[in-house]
A protein has these predicted regions:
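Structural alpha-beta junctions
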Residues: 83-95, 130-132
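N-terminal, charge-rich interaction modules
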Residues: 2-86, 165
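Short cationic amphipathic helices and targeting signals
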Residues: 106-116
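Structural motif
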Residues: 59-60, 111-113, 133-134
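Helix-rich interaction surfaces within compact, conserved domain-sized segments
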Residues: 121-140, 146, 150
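Short, flexible, solvent-exposed loop/turn segments with mixed acidic/basic and small polar residues
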Residues: 95-106
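A cross-kingdom feature marking charged/low-complexity
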Residues: 147-165
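Short His-Asn-centered micro-motif
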Residues: 63, 114-117, 137
């Protein structure tokens, strides 16, 4: 079986289990570009700086990179990212370039911060692009991780992680 690089930067033979993946996503760092400045947001933390800059009622970080958390290669990731961007631009939603990276600063995935998107539409975007999880939060509340699966027995007990299945 081929080796793959996980969000934790380690080489593995299989994608991480969902519980492990949730821990990695929750520990990751996320950035949105507004103007010429990057703003940090993280699971379980307030994103007041982002909210001050963008003034939306809700926020979603979504990417099309590495569907099902399996490395897809740069060409396939860029192609999927273009499809996601086109889909988002066809809506009336405001979007800003964003990225996520593991806690060590590697394993970067490019995506979008989508403004004023509802839970259902946000979850549909995640599923349509094969994402195991996305970030979602309402203004004034901490950033939440939304995993697109039922909660497995090995999942962390985290008050900022929602299991949608």
């Amino acid at each position: 079986m081929p080796m793959i690089r996980a969000m934790d930067g380690e080489l593995e033979q299989t994608p991480p289990a969902l519980g492990d993946l949730a821990r990695l996503y929750a520990a990751a760092h996320y950035f949105v570009v507004v103007g010429r400045k990057e703003w940090l947001f993280q699971v379980g933390q307030s994103a007041a700086d982002v909210e001050r800059q963008l003034g939306a009622g809700s926020y979603q970080f979504v990417t099309a990179w590495n569907p099902r958390s399996c490395p897809a290669g740069e060409a396939r990731n860029l192609e999927a990212a273009q499809v996601l961007e086109q889909r988002l631009r066809e809506t009336s939603l405001s979007i800003h370039r964003a990225l996520g990276c593991n806690a060590q600063g590697g394993a970067v995935e490019h995506g979008w911060l989508v403004l004023d998107v509802g839970w259902d539409q946000a979850d549909a975007l995640a599923r349509d692009f094969g994402q195991a999880g996305t970030l979602y939060w309402l203004a004034g509340e901490p950033v939440r991780l939304r995993m697109q699966a039922p909660r497995p027995h090995d999942a962390p007990d985290d008050m900022f992680t929602d299991w949608t299945g």
